[in-house]
């Protein structure tokens, strides 16, 4: 006997949020763009991996640009117009994602680098020998 679906997904309602915060997390392997409201609740997100890039292609600036465009498009459907941008991490997709958010038509009010820098905390991983 085939069972019916337990619970159907609730339709996403359109949130009317004017001001948002874009968090760009750019690592050496991937770039994740999350757009939240002022209290930190996620409105939309996207990453290079979720857009179909695999392996070393995830770490390219083009993949970061595509991820930022998709996240921006989803956020604009919820009415976001002004954003603050917080960039974190050393990856190659930082500037590309930032440029994609500007090109999407957002009014960017603040650009802030929030990369965590240790005051001589944990020992870093050993140097690669290639």
Swiss-Prot record:
SUPFAM superfamilies: Translational machinery components (SSF53137)
One term under GO cellular component: ribonucleoprotein complex
GO annotation, biological process: translation
Keywords (A to Z) from UniProt: Ribonucleoprotein, Ribosomal protein, RNA-binding, rRNA-binding
GO molecular function, one term: rRNA binding
UniProt record similarity statement: Belongs to the universal ribosomal protein uS11 family.
Role summary: Located on the platform of the 30S subunit, it bridges several disparate RNA helices of the 16S rRNA. Forms part of the Shine-Dalgarno cleft in the 70S ribosome.
Subunit structure of this chain's protein: Part of the 30S ribosomal subunit. Interacts with proteins S7 and S18. Binds to IF-3.
Record-given protein name: Small ribosomal subunit protein uS11
Species, as recorded: Syntrophobacter fumaroxidans (strain DSM 10017 / MPOB)
Classification lineage: Bacteria, Pseudomonadati, Thermodesulfobacteriota, Syntrophobacteria, Syntrophobacterales
